[in-house]
Amino acid sequence: MAELIPLNEVGVAQPASGAVNRPRRPEWLKARAPGGVNYHDVLRLMREKNLHTVCEEARCPNIGECWNHRTATFLLLGDICTRGCRYCAIGKGKPKPIDENEPERVAESVAHLKLKFAVLTSVNRDDVPDGGAHIFARTIELIRQKVPDCKVEVLIPDFDGNWDALATVLAAEPDVLNHNIETVPRLFRRFRPRAKFEQSIELLARARAARPKLVTKSGMMVGAGETNEEVYEVIDRLRSVDVNVLTIGQYLAPDASYWPVHRYVTPAEFAEFRSYALARGFTHVESGPLVRSSYNAHLHVGAAQH
């Protein structure tokens, strides 16, 4: 479920001859190298608290910009995922036992950074019955205790269709519930072998039914082999379950062993996706080459609330 955001050279599709085609990145895909006082302060705090961020684990190109604004997306439940999605840079394998003290450390970090908006995400934890949902809930509760004015977005996995786990997260009343659809149905099982497109749609529909005023959000990556028409179809499908906020960004492979980049989608096409989504009723759309789920997340909740 992690956002794929590599900083290194991307893997790209191989031509029929078998030679690896590695074109230079377009200018619009270049991000500023991370640095600055605030960046190093956030980095130090994460190390001191033994915390993980999706910013680092998924190699986000926006890490410098976000951390210099003293914002970060906290990665709960460790840094090892039980799934092997073909696009994701986060480590895979057998994770350590869940750290029940992690919510306290995250809440302390949110307070230290004086955040007004915190984003919580996680690896998949198919090795535990609730998928780690209780850690999401406890983290939300502790953030609210320590920083009452801080709004919280959760970017959750599918919990393998465990709707009781979803209910646990919803009961903690996050301000935004995000679950990324990631790609189009035709590519889904190859891109995300242990996930199901319709299950993700059902999760978003259940969240809306359980909490009608909740801001719901989803995102996808493009340039992975889909057609633009398929992107429009996914946009329509997400609106059919009343998703409020949509993010669309360029797929970039961590290295050549991952799912290949098939093409670089142009800024003009991203603008067309945004216009189409807004016309279909999304209240906030981020669509651009370097857009990732958590980018400008603090702007989404106000724009999207019913």
From Swiss-Prot:
Xref: NCBIfam families: lipA, PRK05481.1, PRK12928.1
Residues reported in the UniProt entry to bind [4Fe-4S] cluster 2: C81, C85, C88
The entry's keywords: 4Fe-4S, Cytoplasm, Iron, Iron-sulfur, Metal-binding, S-adenosyl-L-methionine, Transferase
Pathway assigned in UniProt: Protein modification; protein lipoylation via endogenous pathway; protein N(6)-(lipoyl)lysine from octanoyl-[acyl-carrier-protein]: step 2/2
Location of this chain's protein in the cell: Cytoplasm
Cofactors: [4Fe-4S] cluster
InterPro entries reported for this sequence: Aldolase_TIM, Elp3/MiaA/NifB-like_rSAM, LIAS_N, Lipoyl_synth, rSAM
Main location: cytoplasm
Record-listed E.C. numbers: 2.8.1.8
Radical SAM core domain residues: 67-283
EC primary class: transferase
Co-factor: note: Binds 2 [4Fe-4S] clusters per subunit. One cluster is coordinated with 3 cysteines and an exchangeable S-adenosyl-L-methionine.
Catalytic reaction equation(s): [[Fe-S] cluster scaffold protein carrying a second [4Fe-4S](2+) cluster] + N(6)-octanoyl-L-lysyl-[protein] + 2 oxidized [2Fe-2S]-[ferredoxin] + 2 S-adenosyl-L-methionine + 4 H(+) = [[Fe-S] cluster scaffold protein] + N(6)-[(R)-dihydrolipoyl]-L-lysyl-[protein] + 4 Fe(3+) + 2 hydrogen sulfide + 2 5'-deoxyadenosine + 2 L-methionine + 2 reduced [2Fe-2S]-[ferredoxin]
Residue sites binding [4Fe-4S] cluster 1 per the record: C55, C60, C66, S294
Annotated protein name in UniProt: Lipoyl synthase
Protein source organism: Chloroflexus aurantiacus (strain ATCC 29366 / DSM 635 / J-10-fl)
UniProt similarity note: Belongs to the radical SAM superfamily. Lipoyl synthase family.
A cellular component annotation (GO) from this entry: cytoplasm
HAMAP family recorded: Lipoyl_synth
GO molecular-function term, one example from the UniProt record: metal ion binding
Top-level taxon: Bacteria
Gene coding for it: lipA
